[in-house]
């Protein structure tokens, strides 16, 4: 299982290379040259130039931190990827690019992705199923179009409130269509 934490959770005293390599080095099963090669492959996989490998986390933008953390989450080639608010704190264009990257990784690697998010744009952009938690229970688990039509106060407020309606409008979804 690979995990991408909301704020990246990079080790501030480690370089990008050291952060991504950390899980492999903990296993002590691969020679250092193979660890470095794997890190460089993952850096490129998440859209970062290998020249960033020797930078410190403090020298990275928020979007770059997310991509480095994603590379670390992918370094062990997990079949399951857990994402905690993956687009939180990103500018809209960086958020769109990150969603494109996640969609591409899902398609190319066959990853199963479980994501926690409150970002309606991200939900509509990349989710094939949505599980809504309210009152400490999963109240609905369905494709986004079906979730929108589920009759529950939380669902109505979240998906059909002002922000939800604006997000649906951008995607040309209308409450009457669901």
Indicate where each model-derived feature is located.
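Helical segment within the ABC ATPase nucleotide-binding domain
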Residues: 96-108
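Conserved ABC ATPase "signature" region
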Residues: 33-51
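Catalytic Walker B motif of ABC-type/P-loop ATPase nucleotide-binding domains
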Residues: 81-84
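Conserved ABC ATPase signature
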Residues: 56-60, 64
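Conserved catalytic motifs of ABC-family nucleotide-binding domains
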Residues: 77
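A short, surface-exposed alpha-helical micro-motif characterized by mixed small hydrophobic
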Residues: 123-125
């Amino acid at each position: 299982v690979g995990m991408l934490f909301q704020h990246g959770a990079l080790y501030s005293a480690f370089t990008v290379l050291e952060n991504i390599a950390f899980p492999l080095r903990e296993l002590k099963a691969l020679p250092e040259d193979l660890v470095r090669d794997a890190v460089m492959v993952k850096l490129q996989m998440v859209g970062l130039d290998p020249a960033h490998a020797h930078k410190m986390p403090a020298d990275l933008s928020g979007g770059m931190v997310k991509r480095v953390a994603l590379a670390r989450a992918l370094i062990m080639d997990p079949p399951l990827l857990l994402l905690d608010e993956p687009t939180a704190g990103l500018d809209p264009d960086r958020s769109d690019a990150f969603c494109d990257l996640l969609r591409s990784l899902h398609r190319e690697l066959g990853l199963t992705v479980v994501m926690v998010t409150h970002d309606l744009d991200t939900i509509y952009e990349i989710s094939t199923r949505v599980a809504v938690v309210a009152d400490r229970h999963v109240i609905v688990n369905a494709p986004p179009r079906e979730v929108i039509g589920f009759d529950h106060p939380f669902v109505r407020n979240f998906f059909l409130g002002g922000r939800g309606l604006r997000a649906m409008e951008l995607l040309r979804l209308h409450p009457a269509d669901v």
